[in-house]
Regions:
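Solvent-exposed loop/turn and edge beta-strand elements of beta-rich ligand-binding domains
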Residues: 1-218
């Protein structure tokens, strides 16, 4: 019912936004029949015989983590060292904790010293040995359908490809290019948008370039 109301653009009688409190309350509603829908998917029908009702949200928000590989050791963490021309490997993991995963879009933003390698992207679900070959689109630059113009690339997942409690691993790579800052960091940040207007916190990794020039004087 909630999905139908959204698809038919049925305007809500009242909207309440949770700003961090444990509870939200609808006030001054006339008696009648109501369908209450949360952004995480909880539904509750309320009728005139029970004007006070409590809705407990059992769904959780999806979680995104991100790591970068240190070339010298092969270990994964929040930062690494590299030289110009090195390929940098990343992996991000989405845990679909929400009750009805939909409208999943993975957003990635790389700083100027990193060049995204689109052909290096692989997506795995639930520790599968082979990556997905369909069910998502990769959009870069100013491609039509891209939601955040500032992002380097986005992965748009088709509804139905990800289910509740699925774990989605995204593996990809970039080159440290000539714009990389010396003795400073290049950043790679990711977040996920989902549902009607949900958004996870931003996860960031850092790559440090310790290259230095050699000068000869005569």
């Amino acid at each position: 019912a909630g999905q139908y109301a959204q698809e038919q653009s049925i305007s809500p009688v009242k909207e309440v936004t949770n700003t961090g409190a444990a509870n939200v309350e609808f006030k001054n509603l006339p008696f009648g029949y109501y369908l209450v829908r949360s952004s995480l998917g909880a539904l509750c029908a309320i009728d005139t015989t029970n004007p006070k009702a409590v809705i407990k949200e059992k769904n959780e928000k999806p979680i995104v983590t991100k790591e970068v590989q240190e070339n010298s050791t092969g270990s994964w963490g929040k930062q690494n060292d590299a030289e110009i021309g090195d390929k940098i490997l990343y992996q991000s993991v989405i845990t679909a904790a929400d009750g009805n995963p939909s409208n999943y879009v993975f957003h990635d933003t790389m700083s100027a010293g990193l060049t995204f390698l689109k052909e290096e992207v692989s997506v795995y679900i639930n520790n599968a040995e082979t990556p997905l070959t369909s069910g998502y689109r990769i959009l870069t630059g100013q491609e039509e359908g891209k939601k955040d113009a500032a992002c380097t690339f986005e992965i748009h997942f088709e509804n139905g490809i990800i289910h509740t409690n699925d774990v989605v691993k995204i593996c990809y790579a970039a080159l440290l290019n000539e714009n990389a800052k010396v003795c400073d960091e290049e950043t790679n940040s990711v977040y996920l948008t989902y549902g009607e207007n949900g958004k996870t916190t931003i996860e960031t990794t850092k790559t440090f370039n310790w290259s230095f020039g050699v000068y000869k004087f005569t």
